[in-house]
Each structure stands twice: as C-alpha cells, then as structure tokens.
C-alpha cells in the first residue's frame, strides 16, 4: 500500500486511468463485435456500415495508447478483408 501522499495520489490516479481505459477498450471491442456480427449474418451493407463506424474508433484508441497501433492495424485489415470478401460473394 502507498504510504507517502504522492504515492497515494499516484495510486488513485492509476486506478482512475485503469477504469477509464477499460471502458474505452470495451467500446472498441463492441464496435468490432458489431462488424463481426454483420459479417456472420452475411449482410454486406450492414457489415460495411459497421466497419466504417468502427475504423475511426479503432484509430482513435490506438492514437491514445489504449490499444497498440499494430493491434489496431491487424483488426482493421482483417475486418476489411472479411467485408470485401462478403461484398464480392454477394
């Protein structure tokens, strides 16, 4: 446990950041999940719309350091590949 006042403050700040970052990570997962659901449902238009909404959110969270930039790129690339394949099949 933190003993000095500055250590107590840092612990409090770290906990606050941790909970805030957790909610942002959850939001990213939700946007990704919406795209995946549309892809699984074979709905090309809905998948494209969900992908367009998800990309800026993923990028923003990568810029803020909530997720790693390579992880963001990987998600975008894979989702885009699935959406394009779905549109090509339709």
UniProtKB/Swiss-Prot annotation:
Keyword Nucleotide-binding recorded: no
What are the annotated GO cellular component locations?
A: cytosol; small ribosomal subunit
The molecular function terms of the Gene Ontology recorded here are: small ribosomal subunit rRNA binding; structural constituent of ribosome
Where is the stretch described as Disordered?
1-25
Q: What segments bear the compositional bias annotation Basic residues?
A: 7-20
Q: Which SUPFAM superfamilies match?
A: Ribosomal protein S20
Q: Which InterPro entries match?
A: Ribosomal_bS20, Ribosomal_bS20_sf
> A GO biological process this protein is involved in?
translation
Q: Does the keyword Ribosomal protein apply?
A: yes
Q: Which Gene3D superfamilies match?
A: Ribosomal protein S20
Sorted UniProt keywords: Ribonucleoprotein, Ribosomal protein, RNA-binding, rRNA-binding
Q: Do you know which Pfam families this protein is assigned to?
A: Ribosomal_S20p
* Functional summary from the UniProt entry: Binds directly to 16S ribosomal RNA.
Q: Which family does it belong to?
A: Belongs to the bacterial ribosomal protein bS20 family.
HAMAP family cross-referenced by the UniProt entry: Ribosomal_bS20
Q: What is the protein's name according to its record?
A: Small ribosomal subunit protein bS20
Q: Which organism is it from?
A: Pseudomonas fluorescens (strain Pf0-1)
